[in-house]
A protein has these predicted regions:
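Helical cap/lid subdomain of alpha/beta-hydrolase-fold lipid enzymes
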Residues: 94, 100-294
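N-terminal non-catalytic accessory region
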Residues: 1-131, 135-150
Length: 294
């Protein structure tokens, strides 16, 4: 947060860099679809099968112009994803390369080219920075029912609610129009229908809260594999130190806002194994304030 903009630094070194804007609390799937639309200058297509399964609109925002011209085999891209952006670019690469047969079957005549795949020669590398590839154990912010994978994330509920307040939606867009949770800047719309839309979003598995959970990350990892011919790099971060009592605590220079969740992740706890076979032990305590270093 305090070391500057990677985008600006790379541009100063002579690289052509572009930043996409995707839903901050949307699922990795929805974010990948939004990234594709921005790269191609098209309308966001979340997929007929996916949208039906999660009870939201199939189409989203339309981008009149691509982020840059000429994306393709002759102009391959290097993808960078920070934090949850790591899951986003990994899933994006998986879909772009192999496609999604379920989406092709659901709408064979108008399926998005994204879901047809075949773009493996369009991507040169994938780099993730402090990404929770295996989910996060930040139990203080999210609570997981391991048997069902149900996630209760106060942040998503809060965002769905305050995103409709005039003082907020005039300044910040949570980009949840597919769920009907975006209103005109400065306007206010909250009624029974809007409450239903909020509940549909927060109780589904189609949001960042689920994908950031241990179970959600496991589900994503079952879908994603490294693609031949594409380079993958992953950089982890650690801003904690051992306190001699079995805990990993924040270093003094950690941003204050991250210290509370860092304590929650780094506290000593009994090892356990999830219902899907993931062993959570002392190696999970090191963290960067939000994301486990492991």
């Amino acid at each position: 947060m305090t070391t500057g903009s990677l985008l600006a630094y790379l541009e100063s070194e002579g690289y052509d860099c572009y930043a996409a804007s995707v839903g901050p609390i949307s699922s990795a799937w929805d974010r990948a679809c939004e990234l594709y639309a921005q790269l191609t200058g098209t309308t966001v297509d979340y997929g007929a099968a996916h949208s039906a399964a999660h009870n939201h609109d199939r189409y989203g925002k339309t981008y009149a112009q691509p982020l840059f011209s000429g994306w393709g085999p002759e102009k391959r891209i290097h993808l960078f994803g920070h934090s949850f952006g790591g899951a986003t670019v990994r899933l994006f690469t998986q879909i772009a390369c192999e496609g999604i047969q379920e989406e092709i079957d659901a709408s064979p005549t108008d399926v998005s080219p994204f879901f047809r795949g075949g773009m493996d020669s369009w991507i040169y590398s994938v780099t993730t920075l402090a990404a929770p590839h295996n989910g996060t154990t930040m139990d203080g912010a999210m609570r997981e029912d391991d048997a069902t994978g149900a996630i209760y994330l106060p942040l998503t509920t809060l965002a769905g609610a305050i995103g409709n307040l005039p003082v907020v939606n005039g300044m910040y867009d949570f980009q949840l129009s597919q769920f009907g949770l975006t209103t005109l800047p400065g306007s206010y719309a909250f009624n029974v229908a809007r409450l239903s839309e909020m509940l549909n979003f927060t109780t589904s598995r189609d949001h960042a809260g689920y994908d950031l959970s241990l179970r959600g990350a496991y589900d994503l990892n079952c879908q994603i594999k490294a693609q031949p011919g594409i380079y993958y790099f992953s950089y982890a971060a650690c801003a904690t130190q051992a306190d001699g009592k079995g805990n990993w605590v924040p270093i003094s220079s950690m941003e204050t806002i991250f210290k509370a969740p860092s304590f929650l992740i780094g506290r000593k706890a009994e090892p356990y194994t999830t219902s899907f076979g993931l062993e959570i032990n002392a190696e999970w305590r090191q963290n960067d304030g939000l994301v486990n270093t492991i």
